[in-house]
Amino acid sequence: MKTQDVKMYATQQLHRLQALPDNQRRAELAKLRRGIGHAPGELPELWGSFLLEMPESFQGRSAPSAAEWAVYLALTLYAVHQQGNDRPMNCPGNTLGRAVRQLAERNSAGQDWTEASVLRRFNALATAEEITEISHHLRGMIQLLSAAKDGGIPLDYPQLAADLYELQCTDPRYAQTPANVRLRWGQDLYRDPKPALDEKEKEN
């Protein structure tokens, strides 16, 4: 599988976006937002935004490949997420499960975060199978993260691209891969967000 290559390419494209002058970056992000709800390649104005320097092995023949879908969704959703937020909404290490946990805790106002309504949305996303259905649920989740109380909650977009690529896996040799992605989401959601005690504290 090309998981790490997809993640690396998404990282490169995000760095390219972030390095643009302000006016040019805003224009590029606005263009990417217009791609929401469309399939990769459907809008010619976006070809360069996600196909620039894309490895030939990523490219589909008769339809968008899993890699093209993954990169396209990561970039267009990042553009939605960044809108209205001054600080970068791409944050390495803040996976989807962790970001949803942060959102649930903020929305629970001191109550049990596991009862937060956002978790029902997350469950709908996690059980979606078709990439278009995944895209629909993910868009709603990104909008919630963007509009979170006390400022938007960022997300690791290269990792999201990798997850989206693996969710589309149909190779029987890697039949467990989509389930493993969902398991990681659940693990990150329920993992204790507090830093572990260091060895000295444990000894005391």
Give the label of every model feature segment:
Residues 17, 21, 36-39, 82, ...:
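Short, flexible helical or helix-coil boundary motifs
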